[in-house]
Design a protein with these regions (language model features):
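N-terminal secretory signal peptides that target proteins for export/translocation
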Residues: 1-12
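Alpha-helical and His/Cys-centered functional microenvironments
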Residues: 9-11, 17, 52, 358
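Bacterial N-terminal signal peptides
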Residues: 15-25, 29
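Gram-negative and organellar
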Residues: 31-440
Length: 440
């Protein structure tokens, strides 16, 4: 993908952002006068919002604290407009949304001092009858100098690429076989294209998902799921092509109308067939065999949600998974993830939103140091990678369409191994901001 250069001169960007802001508000006001043709009641046919923020970032380039260079900090200005359309009909409903996020770091003063992301989301659902419905969905994300939040949740250190394209398309069918038995069938396709030095990580993912849901009681639903995914890399110079099959059982239980729990446990099988092309792999047949035994690894997760007030809720989730490496010379990993979310309204106008995420992954090498040396491979030994993210935002609504925001976010990523410790990506980052948000 061709490299995109920003225009020279900050005033040009400033005028563009201001024009975009006023343009969105004007369009929202105009479209808001159009009545929905399907008899919408509570849902507005058109929605619009825009947030303007001024803040400080302690480490916008996610520089490692192990680096010999001074970590560069910067103030920043960001704009986040959003447009949405909702249609509700007798048999069909549709939702479209466009989100933009742009941030300017004046202290960086380089080509990448402006970072932005655009997201297009669409969903269309058609109900053939009360028992059967089909849903088409698509989520398209384009970023220029990718935002850190998109990488942290995946447990990896962000890399500054020229551009990133990520598209997820889904087709889903929901069908109730009997009064107690229902099914969900879904196909997914993911395309990932990365620019710059990460272009060799481009890949396509196709998958199929089937779930059976049995209503044991009005409060308890049992599930059995089958999930198949295949990954195909454009430039597979590291032999990463693989396929995964997962089986799981679980249950969803409603203790109270406001208290809900869900749990899953299963087994995942990995077939790293891309290794068959690697002449240096130490497999079951010895050096150069290009073989790796299909691994079966367990996983489990549990989540809970408590809606204790009309607009306030508390949710938590925990999961654990053992993942086989897609290279025989690398390490298997065992990961633990914890998520916490809390939205609370102190009054009708004053609220707080908090989220906490932590992922701890431990790695165990498949080869000894002697085997790795014989295969001319690097060896790092055992290691641990830890990702922590916390976000907090206070909001006060002055008017029904205007509110003030005060927020803080913290991100930490650490990577440590016994041998040849490559912890250069390890970093800490703090962001604080003050802003306003207009909504329609």
């Amino acid at each position: 993908m061709a490299e995109v250069h920003r225009p020279r001169g900050v005033p040009r960007h400033a005028s563009l952002l201001v024009s975009l802001c006023f343009g969105i508000l004007f369009v929202a006001k105009t479209l808001g006068q159009i009545q929905g043709s399907a008899g919408q009641t509570d849902t507005k046919p058109f929605t619009a919002s825009v947030a303007l923020r001024e803040g400080y970032d302690s480490n916008p380039l996610t520089q490692s604290y192990q680096s010999t260079q001074d970590i560069q900090s910067s103030t920043y200005t960001s704009i986040q407009p959003s447009l949405g359309y909702n249609y509700l009909g007798m048999q069909a409903d549709m939702a479209l949304r466009y989100d933009f996020s742009g941030t300017y770091y004046p202290s960086i003063n380089q080509q990448y001092d402006i970072q932005y992301a655009q997201t297009f989301t669409g969903r269309y659902t058609y109900a053939i009858d009360p028992r059967t419905s089909f849903t088409l969905g698509n989520n398209f994300v384009y970023t220029e100098q990718p935002l850190v939040a998109q990488f942290v949740q995946a447990g990896i250190s962000p890399t500054f690429n020229t551009s990133t394209i990520n598209n997820l398309a889904t087709v889903q069918a929901d069908y109730r076989v009997t009064d107690r038995l229902s099914m969900i069938t879904r196909w997914n396709n993911t395309l990932v294209y990365l620019g710059g030095s990460s272009a060799n990580n481009n890949y396509m993912n196709n998958g199929a998902f089937q779930q059976f849901r049995l209503d044991f009681t009005p409060e308890t639903v049992g599930t059995f799921s089958f999930d198949y995914q295949i990954y195909d890399y454009d430039l597979d110079n590291t032999y990463r092509d693989n396929q995964q099959v997962a089986f799981s059982v679980g249950a969803d239980h409603t203790f109270l109308p406001t208290l809900f729990f869900s749990g899953r446990a299963g087994l995942q099988l990995n077939d790293n067939f891309g290794l068959a092309d690697n002449d240096f792999i130490v497999g079951n047949g010895g050096l150069g065999s290009g073989e790796q035994e299909i691994g079966a690894f367990p996983f489990a997760s549990i989540t809970g949600t408590w809606n204790y007030e009309q607009r306030s809720f508390l949710s938590a989730g925990f999961s654990t998974q053992i993942q086989q490496s897609n290279q025989a010379n690398a390490s298997d990993s065992e990961a633990y993830t914890l998520n916490l979310n809390w939205d609370h309204y102190f009054t009708d106008k004053f609220s707080v939103i908090q989220s906490f995420f932590i992922n701890v992954a431990t790695f165990t090498p498949q080869l000894s140091q002697e085997q790795a040396s014989a295969a001319r491979l690097s060896y790092q030994g055992s290691g641990t990678q830890t990702t922590v993210s916390y976000q907090c935002k206070f909001a006060y609504e002055f008017l029904p369409y205007l509110s003030a925001e005060l927020g803080w976010s913290y991100t930490s990523y650490g990577s440590y191994f016994d041998v040849n410790n490559s912890n250069n990506p390890s970093y800490n980052r703090n962001q604080v901001y003050l802003g306003v948000r207009g909504t329609y």
